[in-house]
């Protein structure tokens, strides 16, 4: 079976790539005040790119337990509502509205309701400030890397309109909530305000962080496609832009507690079936979750923002046909099932830091490293999983039986736990990843005390705020930790590492950064 690969999008999209490259070469972004930015086709008007974030609670920072990106990022913006911050509807021409540098919180944090509509919809650290920082940083770093963007910044303008605990039937066009209407309001207001600042506002991408509420909604993929098409049509009418507006999303893995999630598969398939329009940026099972095991910690929202920025930059600015680590074909030869993958950054590898799923429940798959196989007889025992270039070869203990049901290959789709288990190996989890070396704008150097032979790093109280399990750790300007050392547990002032310290006992400066490897999407496919 083959999965269709995404291909280059429309001519207007390619024209915009050339436009952005030209704008950046001319000195786009990175300014301290409105007026800095890119240029349009006539070489005179700066272009500021809009990012619209919609979804449910993970799109608005629920359970982040604090704020990290609180310092305004120069050259990237959000809409300030002034005296209108708690009212709706709002007139896009209201003089209370203004542009301010993006920082967390996006607006005043709501502490009284878990599912409030825009503009009182913010619950903590969103991914947007980290995304803005990463877009600017990655653009500056792209000089000489084939991106044609010349080492200058990228001005982004962020809108956060999602509503916690809400189905796509709430946030879509004509939905029962106001998220979609708020998107159009912000786009209208920003078009006016950015023009007054001497630039032009165009929507760069819509980011959809969603799916838990609709975990068992059969129409989810079609609903995503409709949302993208509606956004593109309505936003183009407001901004006057002609290029496509991609929708970029990630998969959810927490819901349902029992059974399998149609929204998880739908989020991946939407990118496969709607090339150039929808892009799945990958899964989130590899993230560190809050104590409720459905939301993320503050630093992990930032990790998500870095990944969103990387994917959006590859698609829109560099014009690359970015795809996640996803299956593109399955073949069966006797008792071996070969799953071939598109690999963003080879080589493939296994994440050994947190163990393998299905060690107690669904034990037939305990050697599958996240892979799951079923046929007419039920669960098929996996005897081993081996990396062979871009292919995973799965050994099974008998020939497949397809007399009454197809041979199904799944990955990170079934959990062992009987409660919410986001980020745990007892939840929906997998170990396969690529080798993306990206160091995000959320990286931070921390002075630690190390003990030779110990896996513990100790720092001053509060120094580890915003860091979490799954972070990568390196020694700054020295040695003492092997490559790919990972934080396996994080306390208030103690980080437990996956590898022991090999240097002498004493102080060391360590760099903690989010893990930006691309992990394999959760999927299910019928083998031929």
Language model features: what each stretch is:
Residues 29-32:
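Bacterial signal peptide processing site
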Residues 2-17:
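Bacterial N-terminal signal peptides that target proteins for export
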Residues 339, 440-504:
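Autoprocessing Asn-cyclization modules and mimics
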Residues 38-448, 492-494, 500-528:
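Cell-envelope and extracellular/periplasmic
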Residues 25-27:
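C-terminal motif of bacterial Sec signal peptides marking the signal peptidase cleavage site
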Residues 1, 12, 506-510:
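Intrinsically disordered, low-complexity regions enriched in serine, threonine, proline
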Residues 19-23:
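Hydrophobic helical h-region of N-terminal Sec-dependent signal peptides
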